[in-house]
Amino acid sequence: MDIKSEVLAIIDDLFMEDVSSMMDEDLFDAGVLDSMGTVELIVELESHFNIDIPIAEFGRNDWNTANKIVAGVTELCNA
């Protein structure tokens, strides 16, 4: 499974929301993510991909869409 598919599966598992058709939609505005959900997502992404996501890099506008989350995880996995 590639990073994109894995990230989408994690989002679907955590929030029971298939975001594959709304990759560029703001997940906060869509009601998928909120502050608690963001914490859950960070913890799950860090655990699943064995990465550390600096909180300073997980700003709402920096990781607010599925595409941005996938890009951020990909960058951290390749660092």
From Swiss-Prot:
Record-listed O-(pantetheine 4'-phosphoryl)serine modification sites: S35
- Subcellular compartments: Cytoplasm
Write down the Pfam families for this protein, in alphabetical order: PP-binding
Q: Which InterPro entries match?
A: ACP-like_sf, DltC, PP-bd_ACP
Q: Pathway involvement?
A: Cell wall biogenesis; lipoteichoic acid biosynthesis
Q: Which GO terms describe its cellular component?
A: cytoplasm
Maturation and modification: 4'-phosphopantetheine is transferred from CoA to a specific serine of apo-DCP.
GO biological process terms held by the UniProt record: cell wall organization; lipoteichoic acid biosynthetic process
Gene3D superfamilies hit by this protein: ACP-like
What cystine linkages occur within this chain?
A: none
Where does the UniProt entry say this protein principally localizes? cytoplasm
> Which domain of life does the UniProt lineage start with?
Bacteria
GO MF annotation terms:
D-alanyl carrier activity
Show where the Carrier domain sits: 1-77
The alphabetical list of record keywords is: Cell wall biogenesis/degradation, Cytoplasm, Phosphopantetheine, Phosphoprotein
What NCBIfam families is this protein classified in? dltC, PRK05087.1
The protein's job, in short, is: Carrier protein involved in the D-alanylation of lipoteichoic acid (LTA). The loading of thioester-linked D-alanine onto DltC is catalyzed by D-alanine--D-alanyl carrier protein ligase DltA. The DltC-carried D-alanyl group is further transferred to cell membrane phosphatidylglycerol (PG) by forming an ester bond, probably catalyzed by DltD. D-alanylation of LTA plays an important role in modulating the properties of the cell wall in Gram-positive bacteria, influencing the net charge of the cell wall.
Family, as annotated: Belongs to the DltC family.
Protein's name according to its UniProt entry:
D-alanyl carrier protein
Species, as recorded: Streptococcus agalactiae serotype V (strain ATCC BAA-611 / 2603 V/R)
